[in-house]
């Protein structure tokens, strides 16, 4: 069997070696006579899987001990709703910087519970660049400042950590976590849906500075309270064990491959290839994002018209290049180059782009 190159924005491609290991262990995990899917989350077998996954993630991202790590059901959108509940008191304001679709979604979720101040937004220019830090209008008494580190739809990425002073910085890292070294201490909270760089859909990773857990936040049930999840080691309720297990395999794979420093090099090389093909096409392919804000993970681009966009997607699929259709919000084409996408995938895409332009340009 020849695997295609899957450029999906998420659920995204996973390392083949991880999939094969999961396949081999599916019916009999480590000689136990049962699948990990069937095991109790409170049994010794899965407890060891959970502990190893957390230890490996801490090693991978160099997470200090004064930060708690959670593996929770659901994805980043769920956390967008829970963050204001946990970290902003009733009547307290929270600052949001909107650099794309998912930042705007975070504002909508938070607005149900807190007074949201949109400190800055690049919506007026179509999210083609990041809001300039000098233009941010931060509140004096904000509970926190929220950013989306990488916008998958519009293809913009924060390459530097914004300085928010004594106000905790909370960041949605769903689509760029573990893609390069990360200074965790610059953030109060980091959260990420796993389905792009960390594993399959269905589990979210939270990295929370422990002192922030002392905030009273809003009245909420235990299941919505991060303190309760920390106290129970992410097992307040039955967790998504299969997803957690697979994420753990991905962590081990990343560590064995050289860790985030190595993936930063690989991701830069892949992105340079694709952007080079776009910029060198004489306008046949267009990326409209300001150069300094270009995402390494998600590269949107457009052909001269929608008919060519559709033809590109169809012919690419026939050539073994999958999921290149752009998000419905913006259209066009989108190539997602997460950690598990090999350099050969970017090379195959660039070769196809050149061939397609020669035939249709």
UniProtKB/Swiss-Prot annotation:
Q: Which domain of life is it from?
A: Bacteria
One GO molecular-function entry: pyridoxal phosphate binding
Reaction(s) catalysed (UniProt annotation):
O-phospho-L-serine + 2-oxoglutarate = 3-phosphooxypyruvate + L-glutamate; 4-(phosphooxy)-L-threonine + 2-oxoglutarate = (R)-3-hydroxy-2-oxo-4-phosphooxybutanoate + L-glutamate
Binding of L-glutamate: at which residues? 42
List every position bearing N6-(pyridoxal phosphate)lysine: 196
List, separated by semicolons, the cofactors it needs: pyridoxal 5'-phosphate
State the top-level EC class: transferase
Binding-site list for pyridoxal 5'-phosphate = 76-77, 102, 152, 172, 195, 237-238
Q: What is its EC number?
A: 2.6.1.52
Alphabetical GO CC annotations of the entry are: cytoplasm
Record's cofactor remark: Binds 1 pyridoxal phosphate per subunit.
Q: What does this protein do?
A: Catalyzes the reversible conversion of 3-phosphohydroxypyruvate to phosphoserine and of 3-hydroxy-2-oxo-4-phosphonooxybutanoate to phosphohydroxythreonine.
The identity of this protein, by name, is Phosphoserine aminotransferase
The organism of origin for this protein: Stenotrophomonas maltophilia (strain K279a)
């Amino acid at each position: 069997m020849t695997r295609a190159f899957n450029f999906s924005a998420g659920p995204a491609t996973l390392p083949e070696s991880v999939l094969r290991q999961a396949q081999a262990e599916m019916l009999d995990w480590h000689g136990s006579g049962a699948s990990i899917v069937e095991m109790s989350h409170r049994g010794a077998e899965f407890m060891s899987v959970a502990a190893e996954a957390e230890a490996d993630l801490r090693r991978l991202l160099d997470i200090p001990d004064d930060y708690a790590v959670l593996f929770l059901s659901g994805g980043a959108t769920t956390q967008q709703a829970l963050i204001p509940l946990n970290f902003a008191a009733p009547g307290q304001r929270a600052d949001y910087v909107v650099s794309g679709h998912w930042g705007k979604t975070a504002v909508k979720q938070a607005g149900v519970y807190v007074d949201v101040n949109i400190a800055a937004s690049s919506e007026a220019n179509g999210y083609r660049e990041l809001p300039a830090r000098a233009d941010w209008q931060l509140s004096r008494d904000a509970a926190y400042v929220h950013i989306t580190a990488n916008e998958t739809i519009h293809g913009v990425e924060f390459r530097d950590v914004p300085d928010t002073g004594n106000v905790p910085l909370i960041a949605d890292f769903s689509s760029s976590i573990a893609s390069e070294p990360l200074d965790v201490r610059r953030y109060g909270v980091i959260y990420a849906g796993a389905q792009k760089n960390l594993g399959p859909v269905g589990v979210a990773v939270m990295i929370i500075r422990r002192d922030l857990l002392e905030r009273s936040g809003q009245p909420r049930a235990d299941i919505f309270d991060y303190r309760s999840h920390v106290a129970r080691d992410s097992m307040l309720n039955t967790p998504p064990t299969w997803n957690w297990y697979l994420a753990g395999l991905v962590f081990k794979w990343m560590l064995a491959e050289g860790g985030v420093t190595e993936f930063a090099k690989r991701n830069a090389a892949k992105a340079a290839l694709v952007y080079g093909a776009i910029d060198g096409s004489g306008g046949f392919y267009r990326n409209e994002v300001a150069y300094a804000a270009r995402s390494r993970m998600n590269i949107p681009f457009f052909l001269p018209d929608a008919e060519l966009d559709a033809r590109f997607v169809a012919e690419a699929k026939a050539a073994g290049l999958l999921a290149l259709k752009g998000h419905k919000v913006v259209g066009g084409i989108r190539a997602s180059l997460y950690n598990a996408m090999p350099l050969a995938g970017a090379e195959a895409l660039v070769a196809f782009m050149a061939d397609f332009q020669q035939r249709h340009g």
